[in-house]
């Protein structure tokens, strides 16, 4: 039932728009949160007053003459947000504000990107965007027409596989399939539960490469199964070429292959014969190219020359060997011990493969990876679900499947939804984090544990019971355990190219396991209002922190301590029209650094996101007979005062924040909701006289200029008073440091005052700051200084006593 007042086409556009905006926010930095309705920007005030939210995303497109405002329905700690419409664009020269649709927004992105990246292909990405929207509309129509539910409490393997209607939530063209026409789309898409027979070729055995770690060649099995079904002409042909092998193929790919020059030559030379469609009907899993039948012992993962999202889905020859290698390994004592040590993880392996060569060259279109099918007979109804589908948003305003499962479990157990959510997530971390880190360390096995490769088996209560990993492409071995696995299976990586160097392991593994997988679950729970994401992030941090001393690979250190993580840029990859399956490219996708969400474990709400506007700390200095107090900045009451302060002559050279009220208001409305910094007003004997701005180097630009820790905090300090006997600068700065150091999450306080700010340098030296070096920042040359609690208290022992009294 559709509870939204949107057509399927409009809903498809909104889903794609949400994905596109989220991709932009992940891959570009010219955006900020924007809080409230401005007083000095009339054009924006008049328009955002009409939107349903007080928080917007502002994108600074000033280099192309505009800015954009997007209403935020839910802002996520993990980086995938929910938005309302409309999106507004303001022409800066005229202040004209108008709505911008998804195509207009993509055009702006492409225009802006040309100033940063090379080879931007706007026309192609716009076509793919339109294709994605049209395809999603088709899938939504099918959902409605067939009254198909995708949020049932229990779903079979194939039902769950075919429930991922909305697609990749962090891809700008999530349902793009270039190569399928409308008939193909309905017939071969998992979203429409398409059914089709496979196409079969008869091929000279000298041109077939085949392996099966489980025993008999699959072509032999298929021959015995398909031969009785052949028509008389094809039986006669096979009887003539009795040693030829039967090779299955996805019917769409078969049509593609039959018009390729090499294949046509093979036909002319009698090396290959096209038999056509035979046998049982298969249906696609979520990947489109892997097909399933409940009556088949195998699932077939075909090459498919259809560009799905960013790549033509081609099996490369070395990848075929990875499935075969891991299947062999799991049969050894190495594999038996691994499965005994970590029963929480099960591997759906591809023990067999078929490839076809011609003139000593493998034809990639024929590459088939063949997977064991554990979902046959009674097991076909197992409550096993693709993680990406489980994390999918609700459709048409209905609850998501994850929400239904947790709410139902809470009802059955008579517990709060939040408690069940936390318990559910703890159980997921239990079967995920320690086993995966342990397998990597002890056995050297690394897997691309992203949401599309992971399935979760749920127990009768709805809690995670087991993880299934699939995809032969995603098996690797770290360099540090190469000797171990090579001793077990000599020559294991010769064909599969599956050894990964230790240096690149942590960044890539973090992207698959944490960014995509674990934090994807956090995001789904948060977006469904089931739990506070901060609580879930804390659980993730603790789960990895517990393993810090057990991990020798550097993975855990990277996950919990790095300021930024290595992340895939699907939008930039799409804008540059890169085919990720291009084997000629060393790095076929674009990767970039993004902030580490686990740093939020050390985030100080009291410094950066205070909830009060009242006095938070006061101190009386008896010797000077002065009382100094501080409170968080209130933009409605303090703005005009601080604007006047920043326009005083002594402030201009160092602060450089003088200018129109509209510009300063924009700055405040973007920093106040940010994770970077906040502003406090200081009083001397009840007279507002100074400001200080605590900031967090994990999000502030300064953190990129030194080896920042998540417990580091800094502050900017400004005294508005110029009369010497009224300034009390030293005492005021003490109050700021007293407050900062009373918070247990703070480790040390850093400074980066300009080398020209001599008075500031004198004060902070007296307060216990030590100079660590000089840093060259875009807007200044600065001294990097550190101040610890002990260093501060040593210089100002009365502050230690003050802290004890608090």
Predicted segments with their positions:
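Acyl-donor (CoA/ACP) binding surface of acyl/acetyltransferases
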Residues: 616-621, 633, 638-639, 686-806
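Conserved catalytic-core segments centered on acid/base and nucleophilic motifs
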Residues: 424-460, 467-468, 682
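Conserved GNAT-fold acetyl-CoA-binding loop/helix
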Residues: 650-667
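Short, flexible loop/turn elements at secondary-structure junctions
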Residues: 304-308, 453-460, 471-474, 634, ...
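Glycine-rich phosphate/pyrophosphate-binding loop shared by adenosine-nucleotide-utilizing enzymes
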Residues: 300, 626-628, 687-691
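A short helix-loop-beta-strand connector motif used in the catalytic cores of GNAT acetyltransferases and
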Residues: 669-681, 690
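Nucleotide/phosphate-binding site architecture used for ATP/NTP-dependent chemistry
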Residues: 1-431, 459-606
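A short, well-structured alpha-helix characteristic of acyl/acetyltransferase catalytic modules
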Residues: 608-625, 633-655
